[in-house]
From Swiss-Prot:
One of its GO terms (cellular component) is ribosome. Belongs to the bacterial ribosomal protein bL31 family. Type A subfamily. One of its GO terms (molecular function) is rRNA binding. The keyword Repeat does not apply. HAMAP family: Ribosomal_bL31_1. It holds the Pfam family Ribosomal_L31. Keywords: Ribonucleoprotein, Ribosomal protein, RNA-binding, rRNA-binding. InterPro entries: Ribosomal_bL28/bL31-like_sf, Ribosomal_bL31, Ribosomal_bL31_A, Ribosomal_bL31_sf. Residues 72-93 are annotated as: Disordered. It comes from the Bacteria. Residues 81-93 have a biased composition (Basic and acidic residues). This is Large ribosomal subunit protein bL31.
Length: 93
């Protein structure tokens, strides 16, 4: 059998970018960096974390300076007026 053909197997610390915890594993790679580990991943912790990203609507509103006050009123105020007119129509019959 040939000598020195297998890669060197070492114990390496896997470092998590989110929580900073390091987990020792055996591998042939010299270093491993991961985004989330079992210590901080929402599936294992049960906690929900949301990454807030600006979507296309937010980008549009920011570009044209539209604020929450300037947005269109909802239909609910219009529905109240419609209910009153329906009641008035019934009374007038």
């Amino acid at each position: 059998m040939k000598a020195n053909i297998h890669p060197q197997f070492e114990t390496v610390e896997v470092s998590c970018a989110t929580c900073g915890k390091q987990h020792p594993i055996g591998t042939t790679v010299t270093s491993i960096k991961i985004e989330t580990c079992s210590n901080c991943h929402p599936f294992y912790t049960g906690a929900q974390t949301f990454v807030v990203k600006a979507g296309p609507v937010d980008k549009f509103n920011k570009r044209y300076g539209i604020t929450q006050d300037q947005k269109v009123k909802t239909v609910s105020s219009n529905a109240d007026n419609q209910k009153e007119t329906t009641e008035e129509l019934i009374k007038n019959k």
